[in-house]
């Protein structure tokens, strides 16, 4: 989501927040496709696909989608962080907007508490989200911030990040020992960004939050988004059958691109 109109393509309006939407059924899936398509529309796209809240409201049709917000990189935490004096009023307005767009039974608030040791703000944020939920009578769910499947995959994730930012794990560790800031520091300091077991989730979240999370599963129907391939009719030249013609094209391509270039 962009904070201002997504038509405004300026550095000041380039900051985006995460926004999660699930399709409850096949109609919701088609609606989700419309949202993704519109976010990639050149009129809205700026550095990344995005929509403003007003544009989102224009695109969403019916009550076939589920949405939740509360991840550290999402809209509500951003409002809380940037507006310490009047965040509650802004958050209340946002929750009302989301319930109007998706339906009050289809919008949830989200808590994440899997990495309180290295991310102490998680607990403070979750308490504010729970308070907001009580005021707005909104159900609260719980999720892990899973970037890899198993806890032992943390090292592989760190190596992948090092590859992306063109550095080495040795260099990252040295900088952290020297007290320097490093990109994606939470992933290098913690191994908690995996899919927690039900028992692990129960240790850090309330029973009600876990039940509400399971409720989302029961709200979603099973549906198939895969269609059979739709191939256009194609006539092969010289009355060849498709297998013969494909074989001929492969041989011609091999002769033109490979055979003549072999030392």
For the regions a protein language model found, what residue spans apply to each?
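Phosphodiester-processing cores and adjacent nucleic acid-binding clamps
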Residues: 1-263
